[in-house]
């Protein structure tokens, strides 16, 4: 018994579907029972085995007890909030810092109207979007690194 069903190209119904661009899943390996009964449980049990194995072989150690009277000099947020924290820390007016953060999604919403190109076209043929996203990526990395440094070195990253 074969696991793959070969298409019968002499079938007029299949040829009509193929002529319309349909019928591509008329043949092939069925999802039931092959995937749902055999492959999915193996992947699920393998994932559980990896998690349990890592938990047994390398358990997470508990750190020191929290002391509310011994706080660090500067409390940092989680790593994914470093760029936002840096904007709020560097901009002198906090309302201006929040306004700068609202300009980011507004600019991304306006971007498709500035560059009127087919959305399915090659991304390398969309220069405005490429420049905006690359600038945003590098600015986010720059602000994230700067948030880890003291405030007097945060804008220059301690290089100047």
Swiss-Prot record:
Transmembrane parts of this sequence: 36-56, 95-115, 131-151
Keyword tRNA processing: no
Keyword Transmembrane: yes
Membrane topology, record value: Multi-pass membrane protein
GO BP annotation list: photosynthetic electron transport chain
InterPro entries recorded: Cyt_b/b6_C, Cyt_b/b6_C_sf, Cyt_b6/f_cplx_suIV, Cytochrome_b_C_euk/bac
Disulfide bonds: none
Cross-referenced SUPFAM superfamilies: a domain/subunit of cytochrome bc1 complex (Ubiquinol-cytochrome c reductase) (SSF81648)
Keywords: Electron transport, Membrane, Photosynthesis, Thylakoid, Transmembrane, Transmembrane helix, Transport
Single Gene Ontology MF annotation: ubiquinol-cytochrome-c reductase activity
Subcellular compartments: Cellular thylakoid membrane
Gene Ontology, cellular component aspect: plasma membrane-derived thylakoid membrane
Pfam families hit by this protein: Cytochrom_B_C
Function recorded in the entry: Component of the cytochrome b6-f complex, which mediates electron transfer between photosystem II (PSII) and photosystem I (PSI), cyclic electron flow around PSI, and state transitions.
Subunit structure: The 4 large subunits of the cytochrome b6-f complex are cytochrome b6, subunit IV (17 kDa polypeptide, PetD), cytochrome f and the Rieske protein, while the 4 small subunits are PetG, PetL, PetM and PetN. The complex functions as a dimer.
Classification via PANTHER family: CYTOCHROME B (PTHR19271), CYTOCHROME B_B6 C-TERMINAL REGION PROFILE DOMAIN-CONTAINING PROTEIN (PTHR19271:SF41)
UniProt family annotation: Belongs to the cytochrome b family. PetD subfamily.
Protein name: Cytochrome b6-f complex subunit 4
Name of the gene encoding the protein in the UniProt record: petD
